[in-house]
């Protein structure tokens, strides 16, 4: 085991811990900002949709689900369901939740939302390197499937 891979579990725990802290910071209740009421409702809908997306994607992984970017021993390369639209649907849901919280809580949530975005982007890149090593088909999947935001596809007539 080389020096770099020996530290991966510790780095993974640190990343997951930071993610938990940032999500707590986003979820912490605050007095509503002076945004228009409609904007706050849009934020609530976005946050709820983000939770649903993350939850459905997590359930789809079944026993292979792990908060760590290190793939579990039961991990398989998933190309179906939400994983056919984006490579990281759980992270996509969390990013949508963070954007929604910005609309419902205002400036008080900018720092945790930006930090969460940067952390999830870094975790995704790390996870993709590990998945490429473990699954030979991963690079072709990554080349055709967006990371976080689904591509708009034209309908065929």
Predicted regions and their residues:
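Membrane-anchoring alpha-helices and their flanking helix-loop junctions
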Residues: 1-79, 96-157
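Histidine-centered phosphotransfer motif of kinases
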Residues: 80, 84-93
């Amino acid at each position: 085991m080389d020096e770099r891979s020996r530290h991966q579990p510790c780095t993974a725990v640190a990343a997951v811990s930071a993610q938990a802290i940032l999500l707590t910071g986003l979820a912490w209740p605050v007095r509503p900002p002076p945004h228009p009421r409609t904007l706050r409702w849009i934020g609530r809908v976005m946050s709820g949709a983000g939770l649903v997306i993350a939850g459905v994607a997590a359930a789809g992984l079944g026993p292979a689900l792990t908060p760590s970017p290190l793939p579990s021993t039961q991990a398989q390369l998933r190309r179906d369901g939400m994983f056919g639209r984006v490579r990281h649907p759980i992270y996509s849901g969390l990013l949508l939740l963070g954007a929604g919280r910005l609309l419902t809580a205002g400036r008080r949530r900018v720092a945790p939302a930006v930090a969460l975005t940067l952390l999830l982007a870094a975790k995704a890149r790390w996870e993709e390197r590990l998945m490429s090593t473990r699954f030979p088909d991963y690079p072709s999947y990554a080349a055709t499937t967006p990371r976080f935001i689904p591509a708009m596809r034209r309908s065929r007539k």
